[in-house]
Amino acid sequence: MYIRKSKLQYHAKPEKSNPIIARRLQEILGGQWGETTGMLAYTLQGWNTVGNEKYKDLLLDTGTEEMGHMEMLATMINDLLHDAPTDTIEKLARNSDPATAAILGGMDPQHAFVNGLGAGLSDSNGNPWSANFIISSGNLLADMRFNVVRESQARLQVSRNFLQTEDKGVRDMLSYLMARETQHQLQFLKACEELEEKYGPVVPHGTQDLQKQGKEFTHTLYNFSEGEAAQALEGETARDGNKFHYSSDPIMAGGEPDLTAAPEILRNTPPEDPSTAVEEGRRMLEGEQNTCLLYTSPSPRDAHES
């Protein structure tokens, strides 16, 4: 269950209105690596973690914190849009020529048209947030590695936003978010370290016997480009304790493919006698229909009568 507190987790008050900054913050709220992604990814991972209370609590605590970050960003965006030039936005809605669009000066029109001068779950270009951004695989190590990437990308974008604004209030909030994302990176890295020690560095563990190939495939870096800079890995130790090898000539062990061509009619190649094209197409369609009939399940009524 969740209990809502009326106070924000941290300050979220700009010095003055600025719809351009509001648009930039949308990336941190509803972009691919934003707080919405963090909140829902960690929460779903936590719900799906059964039998490991340590990591379950870690994920759910962090996911709940991210919800507070979403609230802070939505609050900040609302304040930044206060006194936004709605008359200019209305003109843009009626006239899509480039000159009118330029008047907008970088503001996100969806803030007015869709959200009524409020925040939305979309990125800085108005693309809607998608559940495709999150990962919850059931494999803790794989998920924790995704979480490290998510926090790294999020902190990268927050720091860039920080450097592109002079508003002290916005900077104060962004500085706080960077600090928390530092903690989250470190905690997920620690979780990865613990899980690797227990299960090994390769996901999923326990599948080595499924690999028929030897180390010429599992621990060899192939050179697929000009230059030999990657040769520096030769002899280095991988995280599983084995040595890396370098091959300047990639192995070609599969042979040349031997495929059967599709019927000419399917490749848009007309038959030798064009007059037979219609009849040939009809035969193909009838064959498809007959095939479909073979796999059609009986209706409940037919099943009952039989």
Describe each region flagged by the PLM:
Residues 48-54, 160-174, 195-198:
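Inter-helical turn/loop segments and adjacent helix faces that build the functional surface
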Residues 58-79, 150-153, 157, 173-194, ...:
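Alpha-helical scaffold segments in carbohydrate-active enzymes
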Residues 18-51, 64, 68-72, 137-165:
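Alpha-helical bundle segments that constitute or directly flank the non-heme di-iron/ferroxidase center
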Residues 2-4, 63-117, 188-195:
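Conserved alpha-helical segments that form or flank metal/cofactor-binding pockets of metalloenzymes
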Residues 211-294:
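C-terminal accessory extensions/subdomains outside the catalytic/core fold
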Residues 13-31, 94-147, 214-228:
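Acidic/His metal-coordination segments adjacent to aromatic residues that form catalytic metal sites
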Residues 172-239:
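A contiguous, mid-protein "functional segment" used to position or interact
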Residues 295-300:
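Conserved small/polar residues in nucleotide/adenosyl-binding loops
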